[in-house]
Amino acid sequence: MVENQKAMPQPEMRRIRRIHFVGIGGVGMCGIAEVLLNLGYQVSGSDLKESPVTDRLKSFGAQIFIGHRAENAAEADVLVVSSAVNTSNPEVATALERRIPVVPRAEMLAELMRYRHGIAVAGTHGKTTTTSLIASVFAAGGLDPTFVIGGRLNAAGTNAQLGTSRYLIAEADESDASFLHLQPLVAVVTNIDADHMATYDGDFNKLKKTFVEFLHNLPFYGLAVVCLDDPVVREILPQVKRPTVTYGFSEDADVRAINVRQEGMQTYFTVLRPDREPLDVSVNMPGNHNVLNSLATICIATDEGVSDEAIVEGLSRFAGVGRRFQVYGQLPVEGGDVMLVDDYGHHPTEVAAVIKAVRGGWPERRLVMVYQPHRYSRTRDLYDDFVNVLADANVLLLMEVYPAGEEPIPGADSRKLCNSIRQRGQLDPIYIERGVDLAPIVKPLLRAGDILLCQGAGDIGGLAPKLLASPLFAAAQGKSK
């Protein structure tokens, strides 16, 4: 029965055989494509370049085109596009001309969720980790969920998987307001912060109203799981007319964490729930922000009847998500080693949470930080916040802003950030021009016992493996043996 479920297209889309993804290598697209492949659909897709993601999809049977051309979409029954793709794309133009439906990725995700028990995780920060934790705990409880995540689960080696149960767990993306397509049975809001404000015409009240609208997509018998520690979530809560469970460190939260203790990568805490005995748990991730992500998971797992034993097991064996405080290894330096960490954080709130986690888990160590701002608009809008939070590193190297398709904005660049941080008088940042080899710059700055954090959402994601493979550090490793 399970095999038939995986092999046959779902009845709600029985007229659709071939699905074409424009930008199939994107993190939001590839997971949906993989699930559809496993459901038996013919999947094709185009992207600007080959990548491990496109190679993986090709190995599953997807037809991959490099470059965007009209003929790529000619045989498709439907096109799936991200918000970054517009009607000038030749594949989209062809589809519109031939009256082939063109749908946003979130609408396709909504179709996958339509006849399943959908769990959607929204919020400015923590979506990927929380979604991944829920999938891990559900798997430990024997529920075998389908999941679509915005990052690669280290244990599964993928960001999507077709399960055999009725559960579908997915991220709900507020960046383009596309999460309004989703109609889950359970919805999480981890927090609400000022980001992607162009989508909301620079109006924070509009952003808040959109989150309320998202929660009202729940049926009257659904469940909203929200973080009471977040002041904006607390503010909108009276407007939410759906059953609600709150979580956090706050004393008035329904589900609370107490007795938090961090030892390096390991975080221990006790969970208090209504009408339940206290539950002692641990997660292999540092920081209070990951305690909150775990609490959201515990709320949902408890509501769905997952046993406490499975909750404890699923959290404790969780191996993390790619680029979320991912420890790449140890870099050899004179007198010892440096712990090399890669992280996706690109908003001041995320940067602050990671720095706090480092200080909590390794209080005696220096933090050497290589940071790459993501988008000129974000750098401009949150400039003062970036200055304040980045100044908390012991050593700071600032790469030039990753544009993500944006044109430069005067005064919103890394050189200006360096100057502003320097003027505070507590740190002298080093500006790194685009394309510079960082290994010979970083190595003299490192001391045994340091933590080297590479952080940002742009191409800095390739820096940690490059440093690990650098002949400079390989030579040092040879000397230390």
Curated annotation (Swiss-Prot):
Annotated ATP binding sites: G123, T124, H125, G126, K127, T128, T129
Main location: cytoplasm
GO molecular function annotations of the record: ATP binding; UDP-N-acetylmuramate-L-alanine ligase activity
SUPFAM superfamilies per UniProt: MurCD N-terminal domain, MurD-like peptide ligases, catalytic domain, MurD-like peptide ligases, peptide-binding domain
Catalytic activity: UDP-N-acetyl-alpha-D-muramate + L-alanine + ATP = UDP-N-acetyl-alpha-D-muramoyl-L-alanine + ADP + phosphate + H(+)
Cited HAMAP family: MurC
Role, per record: Cell wall formation.
Family per record: Belongs to the MurCDEF family.
Protein name: UDP-N-acetylmuramate--L-alanine ligase
Annotated source species: Pseudomonas fluorescens (strain SBW25)
